[in-house]
């Protein structure tokens, strides 16, 4: 079981932003920007393009809803969608609020927000997601 599966199962605490029976979204604990969110399928699959077509399509639709909620909760010019997938063997999508392309440079120093900031941000995103 991957760390992301354990997070989605509630075995490891997370800052939950959205969920349904197939997908789970939570804040990255080492974000590039406040609101940096990870979206995962509950189905444990290492490589995103190994997901079956139905799951991949549904993941994108769920991710879109999370991105809309994120943009409402954390005003930004756009929400970037990035798929890297080398650090954790579980398919996942990064959603990053951005003002410019520099905001999605993974080589830059990541933020270390206080737990209260993380929880407030997750709560705002969750509330916006519930409106969709």
Language-model-detected regions and their locations in the chain:
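HIT superfamily nucleotide-processing domains
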Residues: 1-132
